[in-house]
Amino acid sequence: MEKKYNIRIERAADTSALSSFRCGIKSMDDFILDKENGLDKFIQLRLSNLWIVRENETPVAFFALSKDALMLNSEDRRNIEHKEQNASILPSNGDADKFWDKEKYPAIEIDYLAVCKEKRDNPNDHMGTYIIEEICRMAEADIFSSTMFLTVEALDTKEYSAVDFYRNCDFEFSDVAQNKYNYESMFGNQPTTRRMYKLIIPIK
């Protein structure tokens, strides 16, 4: 990504900085503005940490993160191992089976991510992708706990779908989540999100 951004990312204790923020997706904007049952309540209950992205002091994006645990199956393992860029960072020989024997893997979940409408409407602006890269760097710098994956419940509705955006950022559907999605869809309960993951940290 060639564009450079002059931005500042800072923790926020509440959503007061987002009072004039609009991403242009009605359901998300309503959620941001809803003080009783929306994003602010989610942050106040400490279910997620909110980060504001400022450009020239103006909030142009935000994201909220929490800890997660990612479940993977044998099909997920094959998909991850077959990616050429993962060959040099995954464990090999005797360590591989030990690594893949885990029931779940440490992750950080992107609970929410939104970019202001002005930037979303500009096809040459890739602020969302830049933020994903910044989140990866933040996770890699975390000295308190291991983080190997980013996860997200990508919004996927008739109004808006974030699935293609996350695919372009190298997120994939987990086979475990895909099986659940197919089951719910088959019985008429169409999910509004799709669980996806991204391998982010080399294993040393």
Which residues does each PLM region occupy?
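Non-catalytic substrate-recognition and accessory regions of acyl/acetyltransferase enzymes
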Residues: M1-N122, Y130, E134-E153, T157-K204
